[in-house]
Amino acid sequence: MQAEQLTHTPNGHTLHHTQIQSACGTYLVYDTRNDDTQIGETNKIEVLHVNTHTTQNIYTCVPSSIYGPGVGAATFATNQLTTLFIHGIKNADAQKPYGMTRRTGVAIALQHPQLPIYMDARNVYAPFTPGALRGGTHSHSWHVSGEFISFTYNDFVLEQATQPDADKDLRVVGVMFPKPVEVAIDAAGENNSGEMFSVIVSQVQNTATPGSDDIEKAFDECWLGNQRKLAFQGHVRTTANALQTEIFVIDLPNDLTQVGVSPLEGTAVTRCGVPKGVTQRRLTHTPKGISTFRHWLRSNATGTVVYFLMEDAAGVTQLHEVRIGDGRIKQLSFHASNIHSPFNVHPSAKHAVYFVANNLVLLDIESNTPRVLLESNPDIQLTGIPHFCNQSQTIYFNAYVKSSQGSFIQIFKIAY
C-alpha cells in the first residue's frame, strides 16, 4: 500500500483520538504539538482541507509560554463545522502552569476563526455554581446528535484542599449540554462562564471496597451509539485489594439538572454530585482486568457492543468485544505481539485499525483477519491513533517524518 503525506510544514500536526473529521468530510482538525505531552506549550489549532491539502489556522492562543495556557486534543462536532479542544486557563504562568485541573473546553466555529467559545463554565471559588465545574475537562467526545459532549475531569478545588476530611481529586466522567451558565469573573482570571451546563455522571469512592463494584477512577469513555448511555473504564479493587480496570455503563436520565444525593456543584470538601436518575452498572468481571495500556473504548453504531483492549492467555494485548446485553466477551485479534496504539472501529463495525509491531494494521472484525497496510521505517515512524475516514475507504494517521529541520508529526492517508 502507498501512503500519501498530506502535511509538510516543520511543526507537529497531532490528531486527537476521535472525531478528527468534519461531518461533511472536508476538514481534519489537529493541534500543532510535536509530542503528546506538550499541550501546555502548544498554541495553535488548525484544519486541513482533505482535497486541496491546504491548512488554515483557526485559533492561536495569545499569550503563550512553556507554562501555558496551552491548547490541543481537538474534535469536530458531529452536526456542524465547529471544533472543540482543551484550552488551559488564561492566567497560566510559572506558578500556575497548565495541568489536569487547569483546563477547560473551548470551541471555534470555522466561519468565525479566532473567536473562542467557552463551553464548560468554571468556578473555583465558593459559593460554587450548579452547571459549572471547578477544574479541568479534557478528551471531549460529541454524541451522535451533537447535543451532548462527554469528557473526563479532574477537580482543582479538591486538588488544593487541605482539610483532612476532603474528598480525593479522582478522575471522573462528565457530560455537558446546551444551557448557558453564568459565573462571576474574578480578578485572578480563574473563572469563566460557559455555553453548556456541565455535570459529573460517574460515581467514585475515595477507597473502593475490595470485591465490590465501587470504583476509584472513571476514565476513557465512549458513547453507546446514539443512546443516552456511556461506557467507561473504572478502577475497582479485587478481593485481594489490588486495583483492576473493568468496564462500566452509565444511563442518563432526561433531565440532568436535577440534584441527586449531593450538590451538582460540589462543596469545598466534596466532589461535584451526580444528577438524580443517573444509573451506573458494572459490565465486565474479568480475571485480571482489561488492558492498562492507555486506550479509549469504542462502540458499534447501535450501542450494543463495546470494543476494548485486553491481554490474552499469553499476555499479548489484543482487541476484544463485550456485549452490553449479557456481558459476553469475545477475542477479535490474535497477533503474536502487542497492539501498541489506541484503536478505532469503523462505523459499520466491520473493521478496526491500530498499530502492531510498528505496522499499521487493518482488522476484519468478522473473520478476525489482519492486514498490514503500512510498515513503519526509519524515515516514517508511526505515532498516535489511526482513524477511519467518514466517507471513503481511507485511513488517516500520524507519523514522524525526518527532514533537514528535524523530525515532525505529519498527517498521512492510505486507502484500504
Whereabouts are the PLM-identified features?
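Sequence signature of WD/YWTD-type beta-propeller architectures
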Residues: 1-416
